[in-house]
Amino acid sequence: MSQYPIKPELQVQGQLSDNERLKAESNHLRGTITTDLKDEITGGFTGDNFMLVRFHGMYQQDDRDLRAERAEQKLEPLHNVMLRARMPGGIIKPEQWLAIDEFAREHTMYGSIRLTTRQTFQFHGVFKPDIKPMHQMLNKIGIDSIATAGDVNRNVLCTSNPVESELHQQAYEWAAKISEHLLPKTRAYAEIWLGEEKVETTETEPVLGDSYLPRKFKTTVVIPPHNDVDVHANDLNFVAIAENGQLVGFNVLVGGGLAMTHGDKSTYPRRAEDLGFIGLEHVLKVAEHVVTVQRDYGDRVNRKNAKTKYTLDRIGVDAFKSEVEQRVGVAFGPSRPYEFTHRGDRFGWVEGIDGKHHLTLFIENGRLLDYPGKPLKTGVAEIAKVHKGDLRMTANQNLIIAGVAAEDKAQIEQLAREHGLLDNVTTQRKNSMACVSLPTCPLAMAEAERYLPTLVTHVEGILSKHGIADDHIILRVVGCPNGCGRAMLAEAGLVGRGPGKYNLYLGGNTAGTRIPKLYLDNVAEAEILAALDSLIGRWSVERNPGECFGDFVIRVGVVAEVKVSKTDFHA
């Protein structure tokens, strides 16, 4: 029940989706998870608990490569969970890293650590007997996975910008404060996983509400001109405005999001909308009330239209903004000027204004594993054993060894080189990204992570063929249209349709401020590569000075520019 007057005309009327029943009946996210944990007959969670464990930071999965074989043997799928940690701003200490490295090696099916586009890490392939010990291990080192999935505010991202150290520290602190402020207040996580004794009290969720949010909600803190967090993929963004190197406030961008459903034209990716400027004293209240307005007016009837972007388009940006202002008790000021110019990570060594050095390592697909001749995961662990600063996961699935003193640079660099963490990589490969997809993601329709290295090699060949091997396009591949790999902000984005088949979208830009448009529908690799060969060839000779590939394909009419997603994206 909202503490604010509700305007029924702004709500979607109709029978609530079953997820709303599930949340309302869950006893503040407890369900019967503890009962399922004791059930040794199945390796999975049953009924409502299958969805409820998401609010605790886990997705139930199975290895889809093994499904058919296990079905033939009359066995259930090889149920396990993927855990996503809550790491606002992606900062992790060396001793924490060594603990998660050991757990991944000893207690997961795949032995890997996966850095993700949510600026955190994931464990894949954790079996039921190891789930509770996993949470207890994380708690012991000061990490949890509360609200990294489910209809809540997810892990809060923050620009990975160690160069401007003071400004980055301020932005990071706001990311951490926002994360804490928007967390569920239920003690379910502590009771179920950490053995906290249940206290008989009347629990309430003052921000999220007792039925939580209509859909997932994503938040960022970003320092222009770097858009490494891809603001337009997120529901709520705080764009840092600085004067003389000091943070003075934020422009607030609301309503970004990339997920859609194939064949459903009521769904589409959308850029975030700039509501205006706020001072630092209002940050937490604004964050809270963007969330409460979405809580009260988001669509709880049709989950496909439940995200903030659809609420904005349905009730109008002005109505949404006005409602937030009324609840906060402050009007947004005029937006302050800023510009995004790029979103890639800065690889190699950079020196911060505080004299500390930072080494950004390229981790293809964010997958840290010991490969033949490239023991990447061991390499990071060896660095963590001697490193005196911290490690920072980026929203581009890479890793920064941050805060290195000048006298320690040589040792860190030697360890990185010895373990294949500083191999020569093309600019194209550094600007390509994929979601996890098969074999673990239950939503995957086509390969993504396992296909990307091969696809990039093909694209590198095309660039070289046309004499522009040092150039690149922002290339992203996702296994389904839910958007985890942010393909709908790429210059060339592949979205899985079925085994070996993708939609090809073109026309994003290097700064991540434009949605691409469908160019080829449901096609295989040969057709995709032929199209890219032709268009990259044209780009190499017809482009204007400094013109990126995405700008070029729009200028010459290959695809139309998506200005307003609701009307343009499917047109």
Swiss-Prot record:
Pfam families: NIR_SIR, NIR_SIR_ferr. Pathway: Sulfur metabolism; hydrogen sulfide biosynthesis; hydrogen sulfide from sulfite (NADPH route): step 1/1. Belongs to the nitrite and sulfite reductase 4Fe-4S domain family. This is Sulfite reductase [NADPH] hemoprotein beta-component. Its cofactor is siroheme; [4Fe-4S] cluster. It comes from Shewanella amazonensis (strain ATCC BAA-1098 / SB2B). One of its GO terms (cellular component) is sulfite reductase complex (NADPH). SUPFAM superfamilies: Nitrite and sulphite reductase 4Fe-4S domain-like (SSF56014), Nitrite/Sulfite reductase N-terminal domain-like (SSF55124). PANTHER family: SULFITE REDUCTASE [NADPH] SUBUNIT BETA (PTHR11493:SF47), SULFITE REDUCTASE [NADPH] SUBUNIT BETA-RELATED (PTHR11493). Gene3D superfamilies: Sulfite Reductase Hemoprotein, domain 1. Its EC number is 1.8.1.2. GO terms for biological process: cysteine biosynthetic process; hydrogen sulfide biosynthetic process; sulfate assimilation. InterPro entries: CysI, NiRdtase/SiRdtase_haem-b_fer, Nit/Sulf_reduc_fer-like_dom_sf, NO2/SO3_Rdtase_4Fe4S_dom, NO2/SO3_Rdtase_4Fe4S_prot, NO2/SO3_Rdtase_4Fe4S_sf, NO2/SO3_Rdtase_FeS/sirohaem_BS. [4Fe-4S] cluster binds at residues 435, 441, 480, 484. Siroheme binds at residue 484.
